[in-house]
Amino acid sequence: QAAASGALQGLRACAARVIPALLPFFVVSRMLTALPLPTPWRRADRLFRALFGVRAACLPALLTGLLGGYPAGAAAVTELYRAGALSKAEAERALCFCNNSGPGFFAGLIGAAVLGDVRRGLILYGLHALSALLTGLLLPGSAPPAALRTVRREKPVLSSLLPEAVQGSCAALLQVSGLIVFFSSMLAVLRAAGLTALLPNRLAEALACGALELSSGILLLSGHGAEAACALLMGWGGLCVHFQAMSLWQTAGLRPHGYFSAKLLHGLLSAVLALACFAPSPAALLSAGALTACALLAPLLRKIRAGNLRHAAV
């Protein structure tokens, strides 16, 4: 009975929040990658390589992830790789910082329902977006400048472009919804078995549940002082989100080995910045300043190291 109740709750969440929020971004992402559009961002390749170690072609995926939410960024990166806009190494690297949450989740669920202040939710979204960029800056190394795959595609027929994009997006959303229902059912069983009651306090329960399924953990938090915990969970994303992203990128043969470490780093960066913003203390401010400085210096250090390697080769 607990499993059925949890599954029903997951289905309601999919119908009310997940599908309406993600479907437009999934469809637009597929349509854009199918069209032979010009790529004006190629001029920014040198800047993007210095900052993030990938081509500037990942910018649409980064924006899609920050606007559409989990796992729209992973879907966009996968489509860019399929279209030949990113190499395999670049796509796997981009997945580590392009799969993020969107402003709707922060404003609606965190701001209005959890913190009771939409403005604080939007501030947390800004910190979440900043932490995603810092994560991309702090990733070690860079994707090798390999030649892009030549993808042979027929000229798209405009009359079939939208139906095909909707069909592919619905198939992807079916996988995403199935995982949400499964994790919701599993959490309901764990609660019914009394396993979550073994945790020492409500914060520990929220973090444990959120590590598995994001919204379940977020809803256990409330009031002032919950900002850092919300930021940590949103940066991490939860195993349910990660399995959703995996179901998308594995269909293209991608294997981003540093993905989980990057999402953990994203969560920690978000939590430190939230502490510095909402509960300022010397330690939190010092940590936030040090992390930001490291992120800003990372491109310079990467460029210096690349130059040293070239000189050594000569």
Tell me what each language-model feature is.
Residues 1, 287-302:
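Hydrophobic core of alpha-helical transmembrane segments in multi-pass integral membrane proteins
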Residues 21, 25, 29, 65, ...:
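Alpha-helical transmembrane segments in multi-pass membrane proteins
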Residues 51-115, 208-222, 228-252, 256-265:
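Alpha-helical membrane segments and immediately flanking helix-loop junctions
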Residues 95-99, 103-155, 184, 244, ...:
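Alpha-helical transmembrane segments of multi-pass small-molecule/ion transporters
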Residues 123, 127, 163, 167, ...:
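Alpha-helical transmembrane segments of integral membrane proteins
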